[in-house]
Regions:
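Short, membrane-interfacial amphipathic segments enriched in basic
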Residues: 1-27, 204-205, 209
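Selective transmembrane-helix segments that form parts of the transport pathway or gating/packing helices
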Residues: 37, 41, 45, 84, ...
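Active-site cofactor/substrate anionic-group-binding motifs, chiefly glycine-
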Residues: 37-88, 92
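Hydrophobic alpha-helical transmembrane segments that constitute the membrane-spanning cores
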Residues: 47-51, 93, 130-159, 192, ...
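Membrane-interfacial helix-loop-helix connectors in multipass membrane proteins
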Residues: 58-81, 148-191, 195, 199-219, ...
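Hydrophobic alpha-helical transmembrane segments of multi-pass membrane transport proteins
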Residues: 72-115, 200
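Short cytoplasmic-facing helical segments at TM-TM junctions of multi-pass membrane proteins
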Residues: 105-130, 212-215
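Final/C-terminal transmembrane alpha-helix of multipass membrane proteins
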Residues: 215, 221-238
Length: 243
């Protein structure tokens, strides 16, 4: 785990240097942005909506029984923005796009395509990693923001349908409870999670040796490692900003 973390840090440094020196093409970044976030947008929004709906079902009647139904909107908004949207979106993108990144680079490694890039005097880590890391860092926070809006809307619809909470009271509660700081931190989480998904999965794919069987094993390991690193990062961010 420690040696793998060191490889990730080294690959991140090479990728940043590759980007700073202007060797990464915009077309490559846009293609990776579409593959990483756009293709995962629908499933991310569905997860956000369903998650908010489940939370609304669980808390609405409890709040109603205690006469605190006016706080339903704020509670759902805070939970969605602080934790559910960034975490679930990152897990969805990691499961879909992260494993695809790992499988693609692992396949290139075992079929000697990476060696072919080296013969052209191109830095393979920068060439393969930089567009993916930049695309994930930019687009994952965007998906998180959209998921937050969808989740809050889902909570509104469910609370209105279950306890007949007026939308105005729901929205007023959201405005009272929500702060710009929470939104900024959720976007920071999206940025960090995006970088980790691309970096960890690409590194795992790049370290693959052997044949087709090893590609499959590497892809599975990439999904596990990216999830572990995201959970650790989530804990540290919460520890820094909310303790």
């Amino acid at each position: 785990m420690i040696s793998f973390f060191g490889k990730c840090v080294n690959n991140l440094y090479k990728s940043i240097y590759y980007l700073v020196t202007g060797r990464s093409r915009v077309s490559h970044v846009l293609a990776q942005a579409a593959a990483i976030s756009y293709d995962s947008l629908l499933i991310s929004l569905v997860i956000a909506f369903v998650s908010a709906a489940v939370i609304a079902i669980q808390v609405s009647k409890q709040f109603l029984m205690s006469g605190a139904e006016a706080y339903v909107g704020g509670s759902i908004a805070v939970v969605m923005i602080r934790e559910i949207a960034p975490g679930f979106v990152a897990l969805a993108i990691g499961a879909r796009a992260g494993t695809a990144i790992s499988a693609e680079i692992a396949n290139m490694q075992v079929t000697s395509q990476v060696d072919a890039i080296k013969t052209l005097k191109v830095e393979p880590v920068g060439y393969y990693f930089a567009p993916r890391i930049l695309a994930a860092a930019i687009t994952v926070p965007m998906v998180v923001l959209i998921a937050e809006l969808v989740g809050i809307t889902g909570g509104l619809l469910v609370s209105n349908a279950t306890i007949h909470l007026h939308p105005a009271r729901y929205i007023n509660s959201v405005w009272l409870w929500l702060s710009a700081r929470d939104i900024y931190i959720s976007l920071l989480k999206g940025f960090v999670f995006g970088v980790l998904i691309a970096l960890v999965c690409a590194t795992q794919g790049y370290e693959t040796k052997g044949g087709a069987k090893d590609v499959g094993e590497s892809t599975t390991k990439a999904a596990v490692l990216s999830t572990v690193y995201m959970l650790i990062a989530d804990f540290l961010i919460n520890l820094i900003f909310y303790l």
